[in-house]
Amino acid sequence: MQNKRMITILGPTASGKTAVAAALALRTDGEIISADSRQVYRRMDIGTGKDLADYVVDGQPIPYHLIDIAEPGTKYNLFQYQQDFHEAYDDICSRGKLPILCGGTGLYIEAVLGGYQLSPVPQNQPLRDALAGKSLAELTEMLVELKRCNGSNMHNQTDVDTAQRAIRAIEIETYNLENPTPERQLPPVDSLIVGINIDRDLRREKITRRLKARLDDGMADEIRALIGEGIDPEDLIYYGLEYKFITEYVVGRLSFDEMFRQLEIAIHQFAKRQMTWFRGMERRGYTIHWIDAKLPMEEKVEAICKLMQDA
């Protein structure tokens, strides 16, 4: 597999990174590969913030990949993402287009850029049974110790905001400890990395405004429809953030005000953890060229094009 130049555009939630990637794609004849761990799911549109209108620029639809590729209720994982990414990446390159990786899931981004060596991890039912009933705090403590043994930075607190996710993370770390040899190695991908840097106060303001708008647009009804299809509410809670708190509201565990307050706090915390991950990437040797989110779109695209020329 031949490495080709790729552009990566990353940033926290509400930074406007998708619109930047789409504008850049129009300018450079590119196609976007999503790096969002929840936008892979079909019919989970409002809650995951797909904002598909961003993929139309000046009336031109921008091709995108790895959105709407999995069914709600399933548990898409990092190993699957790596395989799907390389399939999309090779396809885009084979047609002479520019791949533009865009998203806020730092784990997915770093996994494909760095060529993380992963194996598909089977379910370990005896382990799951042994962990059942433990609190999230207890599970997190176990996960931290397993990560220490593995020398792993593959998971952070972003990934274990529910007990179910923590158990799966422990299952993965346990498997990797017992099976250190990967089944398949994927190459690192050479990429210019651009970060959209949004002021903390502006980010918080946009998060709150966007949350209100999405609730007005029917985010709770979207979740009711998924439950109406027969999807277990606990499987929706597994996805975290909007799906965790709004599902708990829909099934009667939280009032609307409790849901809104807790969800707003959780999204702010999530955005902060995203930035912590990106700063960690810089410490791990990745160069991220930060661009001010407040710049006009044309200036942002020009700045990225100049970086591409200088690379």
Where do the model's predicted regions map?
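Phosphate/pyrophosphate-binding catalytic cores of soluble transferases and nucleic-acid-acting enzymes
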Residues: 1-311
